[in-house]
Amino acid sequence: MPSITKQIMSGAKWTSISTMCITIIQIVQFALLGNMMTLTEFGLVGMITTVTVFAQIVLDMGFGAALIQRDDATERQLSTLYWLNIMTGVLLFVLLYVSSPVIAGFYQREELVFLVRILAIMFLIAPIGQQYQYMLQKQLHFNTLSKIEIFSNVLSFGYLAIAVFMMDAILAYVISQVLLQSSKGILYWAVYRKKWHPAFVFDLRGMKDFFSFGAFQLSSRLVNRLGANIDMILIGRFIGAEALGIYNLAYQIVTIPVLKINPIVTRVAFPIFAKNKYENSVIREGFLNMTKMLALVSFPLLIGLVSVSDAFITAVFGEKWLAAVPILNVLAIVGILRVLMNPNGSVLLAKGRADLAFYWDSGVLLLYGLSLFAAVQTGSLLTVAWVYAIISVVNFLIGRWLLAYVIKLNLSAYFQSIMKPFLITAAMGIIAFGVSLSTEHFSMQAEMRLAISVAAGALCYLFLLVKAYPQTKSKLLRKGRLS
């Protein structure tokens, strides 16, 4: 196994443990909220999530990636970065508190004023540990990062599971998010403060290189997130909270693999790629292996989900959410493409090309914005979903060309790396869909239909996986003997 792939796999082991635990927690949380909330309340969750995403990007300011990418940061620069994070957090709290009526007015939902102000509290606490998080990541301490994230998510969910029965579900959710981000910040600070603590220094003149890289990274991430959330923003503004609730449910389901499974590899890959930034051949090799791993894990989840979408929605969220099924099926295309595009950022940042990422994201944002603005005027969520999927295909193709330019990635080799996982998964999806369709003729509960279909699909996938990758069988047998 190539050295860079070994490093990625080693870090991914700890990150995968964390991600699996967090994903299970969030799926249970998601199901709990789906059953406790109305469609409109779930739409408010989408609005609040959008505000949180943009505020967290601004809090980072692109300096996190700059810190990981650079090998020559001085103590003076590190201290300045730390205090800059603290000041940015305070500024964000004030801005969100003051602008909450504007946000509520945009979405035409008065209740957002109070909710956004509660949410803003996290930006007073989380920044104290943010830089420590990046330093842990840079030094590849993924075991420590994983333990902190698991504990914080368990704490947040434990609170939500109790509070949701004692107060408005939407308020309980917002407070749980404040608790989640704040506890992570405090714990990052607690575990690393003995190794490093900031001096009382604030020297902006020595931060030129950080500002240069960070400005492009911040702009790129803001533009990227705006492009990724423009559908939510426009649906909430022009179609309404109830429609956004339906769309948000479908969107959150298909993006769980993107947001939770991809970082198992990509979070580890960036610092490792950065250490090999002058070796294009090494990055290409690591990138192709990373892409194949992501495809083997994410494809069966997303395509399998489409195969059993009606039974899944009914069993987990209830019949009131069945309107989300056709939206989910279309957005699965977006989810698959996001899985494949997600590693691009690790490569561009490792190569120090935050500028290219910004220009790319800006062009795509314009395309997304104009197309989705036209789509929401129809008032049809399905139209919005299809437009989003088509533009995502265009974005995906642009991304492949960009990687060919930056690291001389051979497109034929790239598509070969994902073709086998796709064909295996497609066969699994057909089997699972056929079983799901067959069980409809029997008087079965949705839960039983779902269980039978998933079991059939999983067995089919494992069988085809061993046939397609014989080395997988030998590894499993070897581990079985060792245990």
Curated annotation (Swiss-Prot):
Keywords: Cell membrane, Cell wall biogenesis/degradation, Membrane, Stress response, Transmembrane, Transmembrane helix. The keyword Ligase does not apply. It is found in: Cell membrane. Its main location: membrane. GO terms for biological process: cell wall organization; teichuronic acid biosynthetic process. It is a multi-pass membrane protein. Pathway: Cell wall biogenesis; teichuronic acid biosynthesis. It comes from the Bacteria. InterPro entries: Poly_Biosynth_Transport (IPR050833), Polysacc_synth (IPR002797). The chain crosses the membrane at residues 15-34, 41-63, 83-105, 112-134, 154-176, 294-316, 321-343, 356-378, 382-404, 411-433, 448-470. The nature of the anionic polymer present in the cell wall of B.subtilis depends on phosphate availability. Under phosphate-replete growth conditions teichoic acids are present, whereas under phosphate-depleted conditions, at least part of the wall teichoic acid is replaced with teichuronic acid, a non-phosphate containing anionic polymer. The synthesis of teichuronic acid is accompanied by degradation of teichoic acid and reutilization of liberated phosphate for other cellular processes such as nucleic acid synthesis. Belongs to the polysaccharide synthase family. This is Teichuronic acid biosynthesis protein TuaB. It comes from Bacillus subtilis (strain 168). The gene is tuaB.
